[in-house]
Regions:
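A conserved hydrophobic secondary-structure block that centers on an alpha-helix together
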Residues: 81-156
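Catalytic cores of large soluble enzymes that bind and process phosphate-bearing ligands
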Residues: 3, 7, 124, 128, ...
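Long, well-ordered, tryptophan-enriched scaffold segments
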Residues: 142-148, 162-164, 168-220
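BRCT (BRCA1 C-terminal) domain core and associated BRCT-interaction motifs
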Residues: 38-45, 145-161, 175
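Noncatalytic luminal/extracellular "stalk/propeptide" segments of secretory-pathway proteins
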Residues: 1-114, 218-220
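Extracytoplasmic/secreted proteins, especially bacterial periplasmic and envelope-associated proteins
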Residues: 6-21, 31, 128-135, 140, ...
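Short, solvent-exposed loop/turn segments at the edges of secondary structure
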Residues: 74, 102, 139, 166-167
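Sec-exported extracytoplasmic/periplasmic mature domains
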Residues: 16-25, 41, 84, 137-142, ...
Length: 220
C-alpha cells in the first residue's frame, strides 16, 4: 500500500495555491489531500491448504495460488480441458470445452498452446493464464487448475498483476508430480497429452475418475 501523504511533490503545493487563488476550497474536510491506497503486491496468508482425495497437498511445494485467484474454500471433481481455449475466429477454431461440462467442477488445463514456440501464432493472444481463467469462469467452472508443459519445471511465482486480482474463481498451478498423479487415474500423463494434442492439432478433454479436490485459498 502507498500513502500519498508520505511524498507530496512541490507541484502539489503550487496547484493548491492556484486553486485557493480562485476561491476553491478543499473537498476533503480541511485538506486538499485525498488519501488512497493502491495494491502493489500480493502474499499468502495463513489459511492456504489443499486435499486431493484424502492426501494433503503442501502450498508452495505441490501447488501455488495465482495472483488473480479468488479466496475461499472450493471443493469438487476435476475435469481436463486441453489447453483451456475457446477460440472461434475466421483463421482459427479451437474449443477445449466442446465435449465436456465443467459447471461446478475444477477444470484442469495445460499452460501455453500447441504452438508455444511460434511467437506469431494465432494462439498467442489467447494463451495468457488470466484469459484462460476468464474462459473457465464463463463456462461455470468452480475453479481452474493449470499444469505445465514438459518444458517447464517448478511452480510459477506468486506475483501481482495489476488489474487481475480476485477475478472471480480460484486459480492454482499444480506441481508436475501432482498433475501426473491426477492424470494417471485416466491413463494419461502430461507428456502423452501434450505430444498427442500438438501432433494431431486436436483438443483432448475428459472427466477425471475418482478425483475430488478441496482447496482453501487465502490471499492478501
Amino acid at each position: 500500500d502507498y500513502n500519498f501523504e508520505s511524498g507530496i511533490p512541490e507541484s502539489f503545493h503550487v496547484l493548491v495555491k492556484e486553486l485557493k487563488s480562485y476561491g476553491i476550497g478543499p473537498g476533503n474536510g480541511d485538506s486538499f489531500i485525498q488519501p488512497f491506497d493502491i495494491t502493489t503486491g500480493i502474499k499468502l496468508k495463513d489459511n492456504n491448504h489443499a486435499v486431493l482425495n484424502k492426501d494433503s497437498l503442501a502450498v508452495e511445494t505441490d501447488y501455488i495460488p495465482l495472483s488473480f485467484s479468488s479466496s475461499g474454500i472450493t471443493k469438487g471433481p476435476v475435469v481436463f480441458a486441453g489447453y483451456g481455449l475457446n477460440i472461434n475466429e475466421e483463421q482459427l477454431q479451437w474449443n477445449d470445452y466442446a465435449e465436456i461440462d465443467v459447471k461446478d467442477k475444477w477444470v484442469m488445463v495445460m499452460r501455453h498452446s500447441p504452438e508455444r514456440e511460434n511467437s506469431h501464432s494465432l494462439f498467442s493472444s489467447h494463451s495468457p493464464l488470466h484469459k484462460k481463467m476468464l474462459v473457465a469462469r464463463d463456462k461455470g467452472a468452480a475453479g481452474i487448475i493449470f499444469i505445465s508443459q514438459l518444458e517447464d519445471e517448478g511452480l510459477l511465482p506468486l506475483s501481482y498483476i495489476p488489474g487481475y486480482n480476485n477475478a472471480g474463481i480460484p486459480a492454482v498451478h499444480l506441481s508436475n508430480d501432482v498433475a501426473d498423479k491426477i492424470l494417471s487415474n485416466n491413463g494419461w500423463s502430461r507428456q502423452k497429452i501434450q505430444e498427442t494434442m500438438n501432433r494431431s492439432f486436436e483438443s483432448i478433454s475428459f472427466y477425471i475418475d475418482k478425483t475430488i479436490l478441496k482447496i482453501s485459498i487465502d490471499l492478501e
